[in-house]
Amino acid sequence: MNLKDYIRSIPDYPKKGILFRDITTLIKDADAFEECINQIIERSKNYKIDKIAAIESRGFVFASAVSYLLKKPFIMFRKKNKLPAETHSVDFELEYGTATIEVHKDSIDKDDSVLIIDDLIATGGTAEAAAKLVEMSNAKIAAFVFAINLFDLGGSDNLVKKGYKVENLMDFPGH
């Protein structure tokens, strides 16, 4: 099964000049979604994994299924002020401004090896912020797994250059 066949491309969304890669067409097809989860697990099996983390919100769709099947704890990286307990937080740059993601301080233990899953990587700013949250807990990144890599935007390559392991299921141009 070619997962790329299940990704809808929407031009000029959310703004002119952007070609949006829509995963909803993949996750609404049970067989395609199952194949995607199986591919994430296959790409992850060579890494030591203590916990699985995901970036809000579409990353949760994939990571919670993987976490369940691998019987590993699931950690949520959330937008600012969405978690009720004490958090670590990281600010990062977006195209137009800054954003903040957080994780509960008690979610990740020292020396944990954390697999980070997200639906898509573009420039990699959010992924780098997630890595910082893991490292603030004195834990390490097992690897990143992205369903979609917008290869011409360079995020995946930037993570590799910083020494992280990266697995991409599908490559698309970002424009």
UniProtKB/Swiss-Prot annotation:
Record localization: Cytoplasm
This protein's pathway: Purine metabolism; AMP biosynthesis via salvage pathway; AMP from adenine: step 1/1
Protein's UniProt name: Adenine phosphoribosyltransferase
Biological role stated in the UniProt entry: Catalyzes a salvage reaction resulting in the formation of AMP, that is energically less costly than de novo synthesis.
Disulfide partners: none
Major localisation: cytoplasm
Catalytic activity: AMP + diphosphate = 5-phospho-alpha-D-ribose 1-diphosphate + adenine
SUPFAM superfamilies with a match to the protein in the record: PRTase-like
Gene: apt
HAMAP family: Aden_phosphoribosyltr
